Design a protein with these regions (language model features):
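Conserved ABC nucleotide-binding domain
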Residues: 123-139, 157-162
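Conserved switch/coupling elements of ABC/ABC-like ATPase nucleotide-binding domains
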Residues: 215, 219-229
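Catalytic Walker B motif of ABC-type/P-loop ATPase nucleotide-binding domains
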Residues: 163-169
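The feature captures the beta-strand-to-loop junction immediately N-terminal to the Walker
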Residues: 40-42
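H-loop/switch region of ABC-family ATPase nucleotide-binding domains
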Residues: 201-202
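Helix-to-loop junction immediately C-terminal to a conserved catalytic motif
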Residues: 55
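ABC ATPase nucleotide-binding domains
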Residues: 229, 233-262
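Conserved ABC transporter NBD signature motif
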Residues: 63-71
């Protein structure tokens, strides 16, 4: 059997704390190429920290994280950029750069770029942002900037196969009308190339309808690694300390929070 694409082997992450660093984990998780996994949990649970650990942006204080069987610490940055693309929650300010140059930053680590402008335009189209070509990034709305950054990550992974996409709240700043279309587009993009897609989300309905597995994180630990199926409802209620109602029709699943008794 082929190795998992990514493995966390009892990996811990030391976080600043008082009076001593408070470790997150240990995490023992794995995923394979082509899988779609949503990371869910309350605010402050450690979802973004887990994603940084998986990306190699925050090194493990104990245990290790393996990409294709090799510890992330042993990958050079250029080789790592060719195998995984990351969309963090906090984006660096791109000042007055034109949109197409921001998107092209995803291609920098790949060296020679025979696709050139074609890939940049196709990535912007996939993020429903073609009309932003030529605009200055710092003049865009928050939602427009989010789409450009999504296009940057897609451009980085455009001509790779069976890589890893790590995205942190990729659709948080977008209007509801765009969210479903872009989530469909991101999932289709990953599936067409065999990429594993891991997304930190707050939207339970996106997670249940667009992802196969759920990693439920609470207080820096894994509460559950489960399938995104109705049977996960009790675990989600435990995760958020609230009651949920599950609705289902031909269009998919919907989870509604129930008002707590006074």
């Amino acid at each position: 059997m082929a190795l998992p694409l990514l493995q966390l082997q009892a990996a811990e992450l030391a976080l600043p704390g008082r009076p001593a660093p408070a470790p997150m984990g240990p995490f023992s998780l794995s995923l394979r190429a082509g899988e779609r996994i949503a990371i869910l949990g309350p605010s402050g649970a450690g979802k973004s920290s887990l994603l940084r650990l998986m990306a190699g942006d925050s090194p493990a204080s104990r245990g290790q994280v393996l990409l294709e069987g090799r510890a992330l610490a042993h990958w050079d940055r250029a080789a790592l950029a060719r195998r995984r693309a990351v969309l963090p929650q906090q984006q660096g300010v791109a000042f007055g750069l034109p949109v197409e140059l921001v998107v092209s930053l995803g291609r920098v680590a790949l060296g020679a770029d025979p696709g050139g402008e074609r890939i940049l335009r196709e990535a912007l189209a996939a993020a429903q942002a073609s009309h932003l070509w030529g605009r200055r990034f710092d003049t865009l709305s928050g939602g427009e900037q989010a789409r450009v950054q999504l296009a940057r990550v897609m451009a980085q992974a455009w001509d790779q196969r069976e890589g890893l996409l790590l995205v942190d709240e990729p659709l948080a700043a977008l209007d509801p009308g765009l969210v479903q279309a872009l989530m469909d587009g991101l999932a289709d993009f990953a599936a067409a190339r065999g990429h594993a897609l891991v997304a930190v989300l707050h939207d339970l309905n996106l997670a249940m309808n667009h992802f196969e597995r759920l990693w439920l994180i609470k207080q820096g630990r894994v509460l559950a690694d489960c399938d995104a199926l109705p049977a996960a409802l009790p675990l989600l209620e435990q995760l958020y300390d609230m009651r949920l109602r599950l609705l289902r029709d031909a269009q998919g699943l919907a989870l509604l929070p129930l008002r707590q008794a006074a």
